[in-house]
Amino acid sequence: MTNESILESYSGVTPERKKSRMPAKLDWWQSATGLFLGLFMIGHMFFVSTILLGDNVMLWVTKKFELDFIFEGGKPIVVSFLAAFVFAVFIAHAFLAMRKFPINYRQYLTFKTHKDLMRHGDTTLWWIQAMTGFAMFFLGSVHLYIMMTQPQTIGPVSSSFRMVSEWMWPLYLVLLFAVELHGSVGLYRLAVKWGWFDGETPDKTRANLKKLKTLMSAFLIVLGLLTFGAYVKKGLEQTDPNIDYKYFDYKRTHHR
């Protein structure tokens, strides 16, 4: 470790007596990774909800992710690489966000007192985002690891099997609320922080963005619950012990 690094770590300024730009750079990367994950969250919800349109529609979309228009039957390993990339961004975002978390009881008490006294909506939203982010770090990691290591088990039949027979439904139910709340709040706070849509009336814009955030949360949660119900219903109907439901979708597209 150089003397310059030691000086900056204690004083917060560079050897040139300038305030360190590192916090700003880390904030930018936190925002960038958060934006990517927020948009991915929306796309992911629309993907998994294709089961509401029928098995064939979801299977068709699944195979497009596996590049079946290039490889006959598709290559599940393509999904593994995609999941690994998202997992890496997910971990990086969590690492960057942890800088803002209260790290001891005193900091937690200070924040809680501030939140309760101020009763400011955006402060409460930050707290919701922090709590849902904490839950997502564990629940989301489980889901992403499964997608990364078992991509051939994605599909209307196989995913329903995982949901019910492999008892993933409690995790997915909690993850649904955590992801949709965290993502919608995060996108709202990004827009406010960077002033993307401020225009000439920032206060009015912020109020409209908050309404949009609420509508987004409600829409995605309702869509998610309908999708969740569809998977559970299909999973409960899988009662034939002679059928390999876990790899059913993979086998019917790779063994003809």
UniProtKB/Swiss-Prot annotation:
Keywords: Cell inner membrane, Cell membrane, Electron transport, Heme, Iron, Membrane, Metal-binding, Respiratory chain, Transmembrane, Transmembrane helix, Transport, Tricarboxylic acid cycle. Changing residue 182 to A: Loss of fumarate reductase activity. Heme b bD binds at residues 44, 143. Belongs to the diheme cytochrome b FrdC family. One of its GO terms (molecular function) is metal ion binding. It holds the Pfam family Sdh_cyt. Residues 1-30, 99-124, 189-206 are cytoplasmic. It comes from Wolinella succinogenes (strain ATCC 29543 / DSM 1740 / CCUG 13145 / JCM 31913 / LMG 7466 / NCTC 11488 / FDC 602W). This is Fumarate reductase cytochrome b subunit.
